[in-house]
Regions:
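Extended ligand-binding regions for polar small-molecule ligands
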Residues: 26-36, 78-87, 158, 165, ...
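Extracytoplasmic small-molecule ligand-binding "clamshell" domains
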Residues: 28, 32-115
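A structural signal for short loop-to-beta-strand junctions that line the ligand-binding cleft
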Residues: 43-44, 75-77, 125-134, 219-223, ...
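Bilobed "Venus flytrap"/periplasmic-binding protein-like clamshell domains
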Residues: 54, 58-62, 70-87, 118-120, ...
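Periplasmic-binding protein-like
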Residues: 58, 135-142, 205, 209-250, ...
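Alpha-to-beta junction loops
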Residues: 90-91, 108-116, 194-207, 217-218
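Short helix-initiation/N-cap motifs at beta->coil->alpha
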Residues: 93-105, 146, 163, 181-191, ...
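Acidic, polar ligand-binding/catalytic clefts
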Residues: 93-153
Length: 282
């Protein structure tokens, strides 16, 4: 079962109790405290010898805290990757950053798994193998706090979408948005919103909430649409390690590690419960 809003809030409540950690120095990768046993679900032949290699697309605040690879030491997907590396038997993890177009277009090789808040779709399954899903996501609408859009006005508003995303497909095919402005990456789209070049941006609720937090509330998630989407990691088709990566993720879900990471990085970073964002009808 992927991480849901209910799991996030429950784990956040537990963390808020201030439960004491066991004595002794914790195992760490970056700023991530590792909870599993090293090598408990081993991967003998990773993409690069002696390390675990992860592909992503930056920036992605809260999921990867930092705009450049050398600055990222924590975040939801970073620490999730670190835990996977550890349980696979590695204390060295390399992160490769690429554009979203290259990431989702399967233009990069030489990695073990890629995490970039990627929705699992049938079309993408033709290109990649996906890991077990680890997060449930709906589609959010981000607008300027002083000029919000609503369920009706969004149909005629100037909408921004990111190329190659499920948000772009949803806006055009489900909402019937005509002539949206298309951006190559999230940062360009959100910059256009802040500059008033678009009225709203449509992308995953989790991503819009992170941007709301990053702007200090000058941008606001005014609504969301229920989609039933889930996030998964991308893997090169047919790699014999793919099943093992999914097994590690499932072990993290089962033992509560995923929920704790979600509470620490997502719930705390957003500063609000995603369930409080009203749902729009398409």
């Amino acid at each position: 079962m992927a991480l849901s809003k209910r799991h996030l809030l429950a784990a956040a409540a537990l963390l808020g109790l201030g439960l004491a950690a066991p004595a002794g120095a914790a195992d760490m990768i970056g700023n991530c405290e590792l909870s599993g046993q090293k090598g408990s679900i081993p991967i003998a032949n990773p993409a690069k010898a002696g390390q675990f290699t992860v592909l992503t697309s930056l920036p992605a605040p809260i999921w990867w805290n930092g705009d450049a690879v050398e600055n990222v030491k924590d975040g939801m997907e970073y620490c999730m990757s670190a835990e996977i590396a550890w349980r696979a038997g590695y204390d060295k993890m390399e992160v490769i950053n690429t554009s979203w177009e290259a990431f989702i277009g399967n233009q990069v090789s030489g990695y073990d798994v890629g995490f970039a808040q990627t929705s699992i779709t049938d079309e993408r399954k033709k290109v990649f193998d996906f890991t077990t899903s680890y997060f449930n996501s709906d589609m959010g609408v981000l607008a300027k706090a002083d000029a919000p859009v609503d369920e009706k006005s969004i149909k005629t508003a100037k909408i921004g979408i990111q190329q190659g995303t499920t948000g772009a497909t949803f806006a055009q095919e489900v909402l019937g948005i005509k002539d949206p402005q298309i951006f190559a990456d999230q940062s360009e789209m959100f910059a256009a919103l802040r500059a008033g070049q678009i009225d709203a941006a449509i992308t995953d609720t989790s991503i819009t909430l992170a941007e709301e937090a990053a702007t200090g509330g000058t941008s606001k998630v005014v609504g969301q649409y229920k989609t039933g989407e889930t996030y998964g990691g991308i893997m090169q088709k047919g790699n014999p390690n793919n099943e093992t990566v999914s097994k590690i993720i499932q072990s993290m879900i089962d033992d509560g590690t995923m929920a704790k990471l979600g509470a620490k990085y997502l719930a705390a970073g957003w500063g609000k419960d995603p369930a409080t964002v009203p749902y729009f009808n398409p």
